[in-house]
Curated annotation (Swiss-Prot):
Family from the record: Belongs to the ATPase delta chain family.
Protein's organism: Trieres chinensis
Compartments where located: Plastid, Chloroplast thylakoid membrane
Protein name as it appears in the record: ATP synthase subunit delta, chloroplastic
Keywords: ATP synthesis, CF(1), Chloroplast, Hydrogen ion transport, Ion transport, Membrane, Plastid, Thylakoid, Transport
This protein's record includes keyword Phosphoprotein: no
GO CC annotations, alphabetized: chloroplast thylakoid membrane; proton-transporting ATP synthase complex
Single GO term (MF): proton-transporting ATP synthase activity, rotational mechanism
PROSITE patterns in UniProt: ATPASE_DELTA
Oligomeric and partner information: F-type ATPases have 2 components, F(1) - the catalytic core - and F(0) - the membrane proton channel. F(1) has five subunits: alpha(3), beta(3), gamma(1), delta(1), epsilon(1). CF(0) has four main subunits: a(1), b(1), b'(1) and c(10-14). The alpha and beta chains form an alternating ring which encloses part of the gamma chain. F(1) is attached to F(0) by a central stalk formed by the gamma and epsilon chains, while a peripheral stalk is formed by the delta, b and b' chains.
InterPro entries recorded: ATP_synth_OSCP/delta_N_sf, ATPase_OSCP/d_CS, ATPase_OSCP/dsu
Record's bilayer topology term: Peripheral membrane protein
Database matches in SUPFAM superfamilies: N-terminal domain of the delta subunit of the F1F0-ATP synthase
Domain of life: Eukaryota
Amino acid sequence: MSINPLASKIAAPYARALFDFSVDQNLMHQITADFQNLEVFLNKTPDLTEYLSNPLISAKSKEEVLNKTLKSQINKETFKFLIVLVNRSRINLLEPIIASYLNLVYNAASVKMIEVSTAYAFTNLQKNTLIKKLKELTNAREIRLVITVDSSLIGGFLIKTNSKVLDFTIKNQLQKLAKHLDSVLEI
């Protein structure tokens, strides 16, 4: 979910324009659903992302691929937006545009996206407990978790929001202990 800051800056006006359009045309729910599904689809098909991002491939070829793969799957206006991105050579920014658009939607709806890295997969009870606590801390109406499993953390979890990182991992505790021992003990 981490995206190049320059790409985010370039993507922001496109996301804002689509967000404003979706609000004006009362299409926010459809376009948001399309983008959420598209985000998952692109993560599962890195070859398509690579193909669309390749500057050596013509806009016409990219348009044909989008016609075959997505036209029947998404809203007409979402598809038109993708074609605009292809024609303006900005389809390579699709992932940051999706992220920026979804952030605009979530901010408007008081939904917070929070990244959680954990050593082991959470149970539903653990997810629900974490969501409840995060709602209290952030005053958000809704919390969306993006959970990644990273066995190098040994145990515990790491929470990342836009402005904060909360590290409750065993790996972090061991690193702190090692630093403390290094400063206290002279060998």
